[in-house]
C-alpha cells in the first residue's frame, strides 16, 4: 500500500474520531441535568390609614413616595354632624348630672319645713280630737251625752290620729330625701350620658388620622374635598423593614426549602445576591398543581407557597422586585 493511501486512511480515521467525540460532547451537553431557576417576588407589610368617622376629606398631608414617621398627621376629615352630636351628648349629660345631684343632695329646706309644719298641724288636731273624745266620754258615762255623740267624737279622734301619722311619714321622707334605688338610677343615667359624651369625643379624635408606623406612602386613594366612608383606606403605607420573599416551589424541590433553612437568591434589579431564611410554607390551590401526562412514570406535583425573610438589609429594594433562586442538579 502506498504512502498516499495510508495518509488518506489516517485522515479518515482522525476525522471520524473527532466527529464521534463531538457527537458525544453534544449528547452530554444536551442531556445532562440542568439547574432549575425559580422566580419569586419581594413583598412588604402594607397598612391602611383610615378613619372611624365618615365625612368629607378636609386635607391630605402626604403624597405617594413620602417617608413618614409613626404619629405624623396623614389626613383630616371635616364632620359637622359629629360636632352637633357632641353638643347634644354634652347637653344630655348636664341634664342627667343635675338630676343626680338633686337626688343625692336630698329635699330642699323649704320642702322639709313645709312637711314639718303640716305634721305639727296634724298633731295639734289629733291632740284636740283626743281631749274632745275624753270629755264626751265623761259626759256619756254620766248620762249627759248620747252614744251617737260619743261615737262621733271617737271617729274624729281616730281620723286625726291617722292624718298625723301620714303627715309625720311625709316629714320623714323629706328629711331622708330620695330612696337609695332612686339615687342609684339617677347615677346610672348620669354615667350613661357621660359614656355617650366620651364615645363622641373618641370619634372626634379620629378625624385626624395619624401614621401607624414608620414607613413609605405607597398610594393615596382620596383627595381633599372627596367623601370618605367609615373605615375606607384613604392612604396606603408599606413598612420596608418588614419585608419577605414569596416564591412558588414545586413539590420535588421542597426539601431545599424547609422552615428555618437558608438559601441564596439573586435580585436582578439590585444586581446583587442576598441570603434568605424560610419562615413559612403552605400548599397552594389545585390551580398550581402540575398534572402528569404519563401516569406510569410521573405523578401530579403540588406547588407550595414559600415565604422567606432576608437575613440582611436590602438597601433600595422595592416591592415587586424579582428574586431568582437556582436549584442545583
From Swiss-Prot:
Q: Per UniProt, which keywords does this protein have? A: Membrane, Transmembrane, Transmembrane helix
Which locations, inside or outside the cell, does it occupy? Membrane
Question: What Gene Ontology cellular-component terms does the record carry?
Answer: membrane
**The organism sits in which domain of life?**
Bacteria
Q: How does it sit in the membrane?
A: Single-pass membrane protein
Question: Looking at the keywords, is Transferase present?
Answer: no
Question: InterPro entries in the record, alphabetically?
Answer: CusB_D23
Ranges that cross the membrane:
11-31
Note whether Transmembrane occurs among the keywords.
Answer: yes
Predominant location? membrane
Query: Per the similarity annotation, which family is this?
Result: Belongs to the membrane fusion protein (MFP) (TC 8.A.1) family.
**What is the name of the protein in this document?**
36 kDa antigen
Source species of the chain: Helicobacter pylori (strain J99 / ATCC 700824) (Campylobacter pylori J99)
